[in-house]
């Protein structure tokens, strides 16, 4: 058994996003050599942190393809990413998702995360710059 999660992001970032956040995001996407902390080893890793959105090609557990695209647009930036993330990296993923929500111009759903053996994801929602995780209930179940 593997502790892998499917993670998807689809959101826009404000034009005012700080350059340090852009650099960190580019590092996570594998398109910039140094992230926010500025220090890295020869493998492109920064201490115990690894790029979370840099994998490309067929996914090992979640099916489909892992992608990460980041593009300039009028009024800011657009990000789309789909990745497999190991459970031990979830704290770093939460930190990245919080920074994305804080700098996002997209209100509402900005992504979702799902344990690869589960059918139903948790939504990642931006509420005025605050990341809110909402668990969905599978069809036919009731919540209290």
Predicted regions and their residues:
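Non-membrane alpha-helical secondary structure
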Residues: 13-17, 21, 41-45, 85
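Short, extreme N-terminal segment that most often corresponds to the first beta-strand
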Residues: 1-36
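Charged interaction segments
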Residues: 44-144
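Short, surface-exposed, charge-dense and proline/glycine-enriched linear segments
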Residues: 10, 35-38, 137-144
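Small/polar-rich, solvent-exposed N-terminal microdomains that initiate assembly or binding
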Residues: 25-55
């Amino acid at each position: 058994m593997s502790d892998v999660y499917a993670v998807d992001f689809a959101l826009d970032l404000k034009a005012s996003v700080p350059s340090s956040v852009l650099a960190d995001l580019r590092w996570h996407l594998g398109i910039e050599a140094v992230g926010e902390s500025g220090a890295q080893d020869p493998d492109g890793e920064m201490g115990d942190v690894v790029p979370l959105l840099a994998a490309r090609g067929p996914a090992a557990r979640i099916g489909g393809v892992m992608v990460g695209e980041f593009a300039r647009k009028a009024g800011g930036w657009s990000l789309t990413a789909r990745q497999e993330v190991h459970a031990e990296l979830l704290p770093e993923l939460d930190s990245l998702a919080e920074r994305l929500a804080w700098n996002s111009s997209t209100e509402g759903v900005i992504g979702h995360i799902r344990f690869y053996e589960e059918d139903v994801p948790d939504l990642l929602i931006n509420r005025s710059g605050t990341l809110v995780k909402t668990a969905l209930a599978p069809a036919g179940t009731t919540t209290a």
